[in-house]
Amino acid sequence: MTQMRFTEEDFNTFTIEGLDARMEVLKETVRPKLTALGEHFAPTLSALTGDEMFPHVAKHARRSVNPPADSWVAFANSKRGYKKLPHFQIGLWESHVFVWFAIIYESPIKEEYGKLLEVNQETITKNIPDSFVWSADHTKPGVHKQSEMDKEQLKTLFERLQTVKKAELLCGIQLQKEEVLNMNNQEFLQRIDDAFKQLAFLYRLTQKVTQA
């Protein structure tokens, strides 16, 4: 099986100074693994969601000065792109790997989906494990662990999605660098697979909006 677990070298890519130097190493070391992860998990996510899912590896093409602080592969039910659609991500920062279900700022269904999340809040907390984390900004590494959030904090996150133009909502897991380095390839893939099985619930909720 192709080696898809990230290594020390992969994490260290995001400490390299300069856009060109970092991108050169990213293309050589990280991107092939993201591509392999995309090919590996697209069929899994298609089966979990009932939608044919297509992988999109981040190209960072618009960058001209600042090097990327993270990189990822996203999965959405369109070959053309993912940013406007409910999607999943696997990626890494210098410090950790992330596995997300995501609705980001370009999504046109944010308001309706936020209302649906608010109505189904109790069901969501029962379906999403307490060890999972929530984020309101995909460009920042900071997160809120579900076990440390009260009902009002989660409700605020859902309300924000309805009312703030640039609002985002992400839910998933973070695997710290040391934890990933201590896994073998199969253990790494299994953790991602397990997370997607839990996160598919949030995707299926979006289908109530998109297929209405």
Curated annotation (Swiss-Prot):
Domain of life of the native organism: Bacteria
Record lineage: Bacteria, Bacillati, Bacillota, Bacilli, Bacillales
The protein's name: UPF0637 protein YktB
Family that this chain belongs to: Belongs to the UPF0637 family.
Pfam families, per the entry: DUF1054
Xref: InterPro entries: UPF0637, UPF0637_domain_sf
Disulfides per UniProt: none
Organism: Bacillus subtilis (strain 168)
